[in-house]
Amino acid sequence: MSLGALISESRNPATMELDKLSTLAMLTCINDEDRKVPDAIRLVLPAVAQAVDLAADALKQGGRLIYLGAGTSGRLGVLDASECPPTFGVPHGMVIGLIAGGPGALLKAVEGAEDDIALGMRDLQDLQLTATDMVVGLAASGRTPYVIGALRYARELGCPTAAISCNPDSPIAQEAQVAISPVVGPEALTGSTRMKSGTAQKLVLNMLSTGAMVKLGKVYQNLMVDVKATNVKLVDRACRIVVEATGVSRAEAEHALRQTDFEVKPAILMLLKGVSAEQARQDLRQHHGYLRAAL
């Protein structure tokens, strides 16, 4: 596939004179392009929904959700994975982000890493990939060899797979069970796929991880009831979540949370059902952690 023929690499006729514009006009132009991203994603929501269901099923069976990409795409996967433990209370290692070239590539490009088709496979082998894991390959261009090799290996093992790219009918899409291809058009700055393409990938990842965690019972109403209260901000958030879910006072919420070691779900259950902390935990275990079912 010729890079120059890709939509993501083509010149944008709306921004041909970007360097001649005033600062405000330049930013307005970029913003006009950014506004196209959500509309492009709306068109591929059925594919995103498929990927969410696959991810949730994999995680329910004890598998992992593994993101893999190079450059901006890889960094976005690492970012989303790193946010899952504090947001949803899942263990580190349940959602994993891999970037071509390893952790050092987060800060500085590792030359040639993305072009190594065997490297993606080796990185997954190092994780001892099994068929219960789901692998999501990310590449704005849709042609990154590192991602192709990884998806091919995952598919051979029988893993559920998804590919996220911003060009239609891309090579990585052909390697995956589910293809998510929001076509956001040429970038405001030609070929700079950290812009619209990066934004599109981030929005899809937001939905993928959040949707899967909702299905795992990590959310009640629209509240992150498995949040880990590991700092002052998150302790405050835990209190506010309990208040929102139960209607009690701040003082009552804090009292309940102290009895549950600041675990939100049992605190809510205690207050709404009038049970002890131990009984609340037992009810949650019986319902596999699903707060709504326990209520």
UniProtKB/Swiss-Prot annotation:
* Keywords on record: Carbohydrate metabolism, Lyase
Catalysed reaction(s)?
N-acetyl-D-muramate 6-phosphate + H2O = N-acetyl-D-glucosamine 6-phosphate + (R)-lactate
Domain (SIS) ranges: 55-218
The record's annotation in CDD domains points to: SIS_Etherase
Q: What is its EC number?
A: 4.2.1.126
Associated pathway: Amino-sugar metabolism; 1,6-anhydro-N-acetylmuramate degradation; Amino-sugar metabolism; N-acetylmuramate degradation; Cell wall biogenesis; peptidoglycan recycling
One of the GO BP terms on file: peptidoglycan turnover
Q: What's one GO MF term for it?
A: carbon-oxygen lyase activity
Q: Which InterPro entries match?
A: Etherase_MurQ, Glucokinase_regulatory_CS, MURQ/GCKR, SIS_dom, SIS_dom_sf, UBA-like_sf
Inducing factors: Induced by MurNAc 6-phosphate that releases the repressor MurR from the DNA. Repressed by MurR in the absence of MurNAc 6-phosphate.
User: Quaternary structure per UniProt?
Assistant: Homodimer.
Protein role = Specifically catalyzes the cleavage of the D-lactyl ether substituent of MurNAc 6-phosphate, producing GlcNAc 6-phosphate and D-lactate. Together with AnmK, is also required for the utilization of anhydro-N-acetylmuramic acid (anhMurNAc) either imported from the medium or derived from its own cell wall murein, and thus plays a role in cell wall recycling.
Question: Which family does the record assign?
Answer: Belongs to the GCKR-like family. MurNAc-6-P etherase subfamily.
Q: What else is known?
A: A lyase-type mechanism (elimination/hydration) is suggested for the cleavage of the lactyl ether bond of MurNAc 6-phosphate, with the formation of an alpha,beta-unsaturated aldehyde intermediate with (E)-stereochemistry, followed by the syn addition of water to give product.
Protein name per Swiss-Prot or TrEMBL = N-acetylmuramic acid 6-phosphate etherase
Q: Which organism is it from?
A: Yersinia pestis
Its lineage reads: Bacteria, Pseudomonadati, Pseudomonadota, Gammaproteobacteria, Enterobacterales
